Amino acid sequence: GGTDKGAAGAGGRLLEKNLNLSMALKLRAALRKLGFQVIMTRGADSTLSLQGRAELCKKYKPDLFISIHCNAAAQKTISGIETFAMTPNGCASSNDSKPGNSTGTGNSFDKNNYRMAYEIQKALLKNTKAEDRGVKHARFFVLRNASCPAVLIETGFISNLRESALLNRADYQAKIVNAIVAGVLNYRASYR
C-alpha cells in the first residue's frame, strides 16, 4: 500500500494494493462478525515495510497471520489461486530454481502453517472455481518472520484480463473473503 503499488492490471489502472486492501477490510468485517479479534497491518492506503509487518505480528501475538495478494506474470494467460505456507524445516521452497540451495530452518508452526494453507486453498477453489495452482512452500519474509501460523494467499492474477476483472468485482471479492473465513474456521476446528 501507499507508495508500494504492487502489481498492476488493466493497463495500469487496476492496482494490487487497492484490491488487497479491499479484500482485507472485507475479511476483517466478516471475521469480527464471528467474534474474532482482527489486527490489520494496514487499514488504509499506507506504506508499511515487511519488517514493520513482522514487528506488528510480534507485538500483538496473534493466533494466525494472513497476507492477501494478487499475483502477476509476464505471460498474460496464466491464472489461478495459490496459497503459500512457510517452507518446513529441512525442505526446499516450491519457488526455488535450485532446490538444494534453499533448505533451511522452518519454524515451530510447520504443521499449522500447511494445514491452514490447505484449508484456505480448498475453500477458495470451492467458492471461486478458479484454477488450482496449489498449496506451496516459500520462505517469504512475512511467513519466515511471523510469530504464529501464517499464510500468504495469491487470490488471482491481476495480469490476466479475465481474472483482473473478477478480482475487481465486489461479488467475487466476497467469494474470496467467504472462502478465507471458511478455511480459517475449518483450520480452527481441526485443532479443537
Model-predicted segments: where are they?
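Second-shell loop/turn segments in exported
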Residues: A8-K17, I39-T47, S102-K111, Q121, ...
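Soluble periplasmic/extracytoplasmic beta-strand elements of cell-envelope proteins
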Residues: S22, Q37-T41, L64-H69, E82-A85, ...
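Active-site-adjacent substrate-binding region
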Residues: F109-K136
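Short, well-ordered secondary-structure micro-motifs
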Residues: A7-A8, Q51, K76-S79, S94-D96, ...
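Extracytoplasmic/secreted envelope proteins and their assembly/folding machinery
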Residues: L21-A24, R28, Q51-A54, I81, ...
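A structural motif
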Residues: K76-N101, Y114
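Active-site histidine-acidic residue metal-binding/catalytic motifs
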Residues: G1-P62, T87, A92-N95
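Active-site-adjacent mobile loop/cap segments within catalytic or ligand-binding domains
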Residues: L14, L64-Q75, N127-R192
